[in-house]
Structure formats: C-alpha cells, structure tokens
Amino acid sequence: MVFFRSVSAFTRLRSRVQGQQSSLSNSVRWIQMQSSTDLDLKSQLQELIPEQQDRLKKLKSEHGKVQLGNITVDMVIGGMRGMTGLLWETSLLDPEEGIRFRGLSIPECQKVLPTAQSGAEPLPEGLLWLLLTGKVPSKEQVEALSKDLANRAAVPDYVYNAIDALPSTAHPMTQFASGVMALQVQSEFQKAYENGIHKSKFWEPTYEDCLNLIARVPVVAAYVYRRMYKNGDSIPSDKSLDYGANFSHMLGFDDEKVKELMRLYITIHSDHEGGNVSAHTGHLVGSALSDPYLSFAAALNGLAGPLHGLANQEVLLWIKSVVEECGEDISKEQLKEYVWKTLNSGKVIPGYGHGVLRNTDPRYVCQREFALKHLPDDPLFQLVSKLYEVVPPVLTELGKVKNPWPNVDAHSGVLLNHYGLTEARYYTVLFGVSRSLGICSQLIWDRALGLALERPKSVTMDWLEAHCKKASSA
C-alpha cells in the first residue's frame, strides 16, 4: 500500500484529481445529451416518471427472483454491512472510486454543473436537478430552480416559537430537528392523503413538501445559529442570492470565498447512497407514508449520532486538542506519537476510516483542493496535511482497520473554522441542510415508483445458533 509521505505525493494526488476533471466520462457526455430546455423541474419529472415506472415493473417481472448475494451471520450482527437491500436512485457509492451522483463523480460534477457567475464550485441547485432527473441542467434551469426555492423559503413564526421554547443551550441538532418538525404543520402530502389522493399521485404533494423543505431548512438552520451564537440577531433571507450563498448570508458570512465554500460543502454532503443512517432513516420512515417533514426530522436525529454526522464536530475538537497539547508547529514524529497515544487510550482517530470506502474519500480530496487554492498557509490546514501523511501508516500498522484513509469529516471543520465559523457543535446542522437534497430527492422517487413499506426479517441469537448448527451438520 502506498502512503502520501511527502509534498510530491500530495502533488501527484492533485494531478490525479485534475486529470479526472480534464476529461469527461461517457456517462457525463450521455447525460449532457439527455438535457432538456424545459425550465420547469416538475414537468421534467412528469415526463420521466412513467418510463421509470415501466422500467421498474419490467425489472421486477423478469428478474424478481434473481439472487443478489448471500447473507452471512457477520452481516446480521454487524449492522448489515455489505448487505444489498435498498433501491436508491440518486447516488451509488463505489468502495474504490467514492460517490457518484447519478453516475457522475465529484470531479465530473465540478466540471459540468453550473456555477455562480463569479464562482468555480457547483451550485447546489444544479446538483438537486441532477439528483431528481439524472440530467445535467443548463444555467437557465438552475436559475429557475433557484428562484423557485427562494420563493418557497418563508418560515412561519410558530416554527421560530417552537425553537425558542427550547433552552438556548440545547444542542443545535435538537433545535434544528424541532424546527423541521414544526414545519410539518404545512405538509401538502398529509393534507392530500387525508383527502383520499390516489396512490399514483402520491409523488406530487411529496414533491411540493420536499421542495418546500429544501427551501426552508437553511432558514431554520441559520436561525438556530444566530440564536445560539449571535444573541438572537437573525438575518433575513436574500432572494437575489443562490441557495448556498443565501445560507452563508443568513449565517452572517458574506465573504465570497465563504459562499463558494458553502456551495461546495452542500454539494458534496448532499447524498451518499441509501445505506447510511440518515438516508436509510429517511427512506424507512417515508416507506410508512409518513410525510417528508416527519421523514427528514427522523433522518436528522440519526445524523446527530456520534458515529454519523456528529463526527465532523469531533474532528475539529480533536485537532484543536492536538494544538493545545503540542502546538501548531508539531513535527510529524510528535504527531505520530500523539496519534498512537489516542489509539492506545481506546479512542479512534476522528475523520479516518469509512464503512464502505477503501480509498481516500473524494469529498476529502476536493476540500483539500479548495484549501490549497484559498488557504494554503492556514496552520490547522497544514496540520491536517501532516495527519494525512501520518495517520494512514499508523492505522495500517495497528492492523484492525479496513480503511486507514481520511473521509469527508477529516477536512470540513478546518475550512469552516478558517472563515470564522468556529462553533464545532453546529457543524452537524450544516451537514443536515446538505443532506436534505439527497434524502428529499429519493423520497420523491420512492413515492413515484410506489416503493413498498420496508419490513426486513429479524432473528434471535437462538435462531442463529440453531441455523448455524443445522448448516454445519448438513
């Protein structure tokens, strides 16, 4: 296994990523050919849904009994790792290459998705269009969607009142999830279901709920931030700004580089196929025909767990603990000793390893590229770079880690901290805003395809022991 031990190794990594960006894959060219000039996203879906329904029906009728793999005891007791059991259209995670959004890698998305006029990072609205339609949108389509979201972003006062009923010291994710639950009062799906809407039309009020939810979560999230850290001095939405820039503005950061970072952050955190806790939770709750607000609030509660979205908070806190104990100019040898000290105390190195990935997370790579471009001399970024060289060999030597490489959480906190968003407890809320794009996109397709109530079979240890005994004697 090759480790990144020097600056030249980092340079090779950058060259590899830039090489990926310089040439479009066949999938990118195909999607570009499929793009339409229609500016209305919903009408695009109305055209796509019947053919995808027929495709799923054919798949089920012709191949419904085809086996996808074997289930082992390890899978059952190990969190269903590696068990294929979900249909998730918007993205697919490859252990070696990382995430692909509708077939596109992150470098490809950076190449083909529209950007802000003065920016270089993909607009989240463009990714949302891609996730929902499988097509690369035009600049005009993204502008139309951006305006639609801006017009949907009004949040009722009772949502703020619900948040204000909580102590200002409550965790940001508690306040955020409570705000999303309060938004549920306006659910179009719930009203339509109570009025007897036909199941073939379920996707339409789901679409309205999801677009409204995506539009409003940045407003709620920004309110939580300003309430907790800026004396409750909230900043109103600016309809002239794109999704990422407006979120940055409402948080109180109007620097163009912060807006660019927010566009990148939302895009790369938006979706990571369907098996992770937040995505799976959203799908699971939605399969009961709970409306998108209920489903997404449940997903946020899963995201708040230390083993999922809370990890980005823990990374920055751990990095700062390194600085406090060893100083910013820590040598690689000292850093190696600190890493071993952390591991020997029974803790993990936050931001390293992944349940599926077996290489460096491409979401880490693109954040590193952003840092090299905009903040190469930042002390914490330089420490993150040293960790990239030190940690993988240590974890490999430890011998208990399938993936010793950094994931997305290993970098995001340092970027946010550099621009003044230093409140690490809040970082998971940013993750939650981003994840609304992927979870809501899939919820729309769940209802459009008529996917069933999720109901896997569970077993007891007695059953497993009896089954294994029978299998061994056969």
Curated annotation (Swiss-Prot):
Could you say which residues form the signal peptide? none
User: Which residues participate directly in catalysis?
Assistant: 308, 354, 409
Any one of the GO CC terms: chloroplast
Q: Which reactions fall under this protein's catalytic activity?
A: oxaloacetate + acetyl-CoA + H2O = citrate + CoA + H(+)
Task: Cite a single GO BP annotation.
Answer: tricarboxylic acid cycle
**What's the Enzyme Commission number for this chain?**
2.3.3.16
Q: Which InterPro entries match?
A: Citrate_synth-like_lrg_a-sub (IPR016142), Citrate_synth-like_sm_a-sub (IPR016143), Citrate_synthase (IPR002020), Citrate_synthase_AS (IPR019810), Citrate_synthase_euk (IPR010109), Citrate_synthase_sf (IPR036969)
Principal subcellular localization: mitochondrion
Give the source's domain of life in one word: Eukaryota
Enzyme class, UniProt record, top EC level: transferase
Localization (cell): Mitochondrion matrix
Q: What are the protein's UniProt keywords? A: Mitochondrion, Transferase, Transit peptide, Tricarboxylic acid cycle
Chain coiled-coil ranges = none
Query: Which pathway is it part of?
Result: Carbohydrate metabolism; tricarboxylic acid cycle; isocitrate from oxaloacetate: step 1/2
**Which molecular function terms from Gene Ontology are attached?**
ATP binding; citrate (Si)-synthase activity; zinc ion binding
According to its UniProt record, what is one Pfam family this protein matches? Citrate_synt
Q: Which portion of the chain is the transit peptide?
A: 1-16
Give a yes or no for keyword Mitochondrion in this entry.
Answer: yes
Record flagged with keyword tRNA processing: no
Give the record's subunit note: Homodimer.
Share any extra remarks: Citrate synthase is found in nearly all cells capable of oxidative metabolism.
Protein family: Belongs to the citrate synthase family.
Full protein name: Citrate synthase 4, mitochondrial
Protein species of origin: Arabidopsis thaliana (Mouse-ear cress)
